[in-house]
A protein has these predicted regions:
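Structured loop/turn residues at beta-strand edges in well-structured enzyme cores
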Residues: 18, 108, 158, 173
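N-terminal auxiliary segments of SAM/dcSAM-dependent transferases
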Residues: 1-71
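Short SAM/SAH-binding signature in class I
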Residues: 175-177
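SAM-dependent Rossmann-like transferase core, predominantly class I methyltransferases
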Residues: 51-131, 136-151, 162-164, 169-171
């Protein structure tokens, strides 16, 4: 079976094209950003172990497990974040919230952002990646979620402060957004 046939198999199973591509790249150990490779190598033969891995991943997805949990990462606002079952899968439409928060911080010398329920840190890290001078506090009640968010901050070399708190209960200070 070649690459194109394998991806068609994913579609026949019920996977949307993008999901099939991402799962195939993951099954073959390629970067999830390497979708152009699929076009350039569509007639390449696929190793039987890669076919089996792809079909196993496809079955997980067909059981409604989020793609981000299956592959362990998600692209958000141009950042690659580690994602697992400790946090919710960040939604692409949440990037609109980041755009709004960035607009609110325009004109401020050192904007202060508070991200309540940070989960993976997606919003906090996206803000910090765009405004290095911003002060960002990411809050979550879950120590496990904060651990993953801190791992993401470390992996991206972004300095964000993290606090375990039930919403505002431990939060001190004033914030612009």
């Amino acid at each position: 079976m070649n690459v194109a046939q394998c991806l068609t198999r994913g579609h026949v199973l019920g996977l949307p094209r993008l999901e099939a591509q991402i799962l195939f790249l993951h099954a073959t150990g390629r970067s999830l950003h390497d979708r152009a490779w699929l076009l350039a190598h569509d007639t390449d033969e696929v190793l039987p172990e890669h076919i089996a891995a792809f079909e196993a991943l496809a079955q997980r997805r067909l059981q409604l497990e989020p793609v981000a949990y299956i592959v362990g990462q998600k692209e958000f606002f141009g950042l690659t974040l580690a994602i697992d079952k400790r946090v919710l899968d960040p939604r692409a439409d949440t990037e609109v919230l980041v755009d709004w928060a960035l607009a609110c911080g325009l004109g401020l010398e050192r904007p202060k952002y508070l991200d309540l329920g940070t989960g993976s840190g997606a919003i906090a890290l996206a803000l910090k990646s765009q405004l290095s001078e911003a002060e960002v506090l990411a809050v979550d009640n879950s120590a496990e979620a904060l651990s993953l968010a801190a791992q993401n901050a470390h992996n991206l070399a972004l300095h964000v402060s993290f606090l375990q708190s039930n919403w505002f209960s431990q939060v001190q200070g004033k914030f612009n957004v």
